């Protein structure tokens, strides 16, 4: 089983979009039973009295335009225990990585990545050992841009590259 956690600030836009795009990609390849895919927030801003808000309606609508449902998803916060549970923890932007480090007390096993490290040919550079998290851009934040299609493009490119990377790196688990 390959365990992937996508992380953003509130877990109502970018990280749930990534969660459900990735689930869709692995399902289309017939690999759903080989993956556990989830998403979480670094903050509790979208969690009230222990209950997370649902996916932000425009993000949900963008997923639906591409035939993907995120029904039932509610915001949850990343925990220290998640570090041991997941093989890959994918932040949407640099500030997410910073807070992920705080929540989990660091990344001693090199499990943290920025989503855009995998986009385009990025996953091939990672395969070649050419990792540069600082160079990788951030996933467009639709909370501020209101451009959910730009976020869709970033998330899709990142998830496609991540899947290619994982299929090579984790071939023995498939």
Language model segments and positions:
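Hydrophobic structural packing positions in well-ordered secondary structure
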Residues: 8-11, 63, 90-91, 112, ...
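A structural signal for well-ordered alpha-helical scaffolds and beta->alpha junctions
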Residues: 52-56, 93, 159
């Amino acid at each position: 089983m390959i365990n992937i956690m996508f992380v953003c600030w509130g877990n109502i836009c970018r990280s749930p979009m990534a969660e459900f795009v990735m689930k869709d990609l692995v399902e289309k390849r017939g690999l759903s039973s080989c993956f556990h895919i989830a998403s979480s927030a670094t903050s509790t801003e979208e969690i009230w009295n222990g209950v997370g808000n649902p996916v932000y309606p425009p993000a949900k609508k963008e997923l639906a335009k591409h035939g993907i449902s995120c029904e039932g998803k509610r915001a949850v916060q990343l925990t220290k225990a998640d570090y041991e549970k997941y093989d890959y923890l994918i932040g949407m932007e640099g500030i997410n990585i910073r807070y992920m480090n705080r929540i989990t007390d660091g990344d001693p096993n090199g499990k943290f990545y920025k989503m855009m490290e995998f986009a385009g040919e990025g996953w091939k550079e990672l395969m070649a050992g050419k990792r540069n998290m600082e160079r990788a851009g951030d996933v467009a934040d639709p909370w501020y841009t209101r451009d959910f299609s730009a976020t869709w493009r970033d998330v899709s490119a990142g998830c496609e590259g991540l899947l290619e990377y994982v299929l090579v790196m984790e071939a023995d688990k498939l």
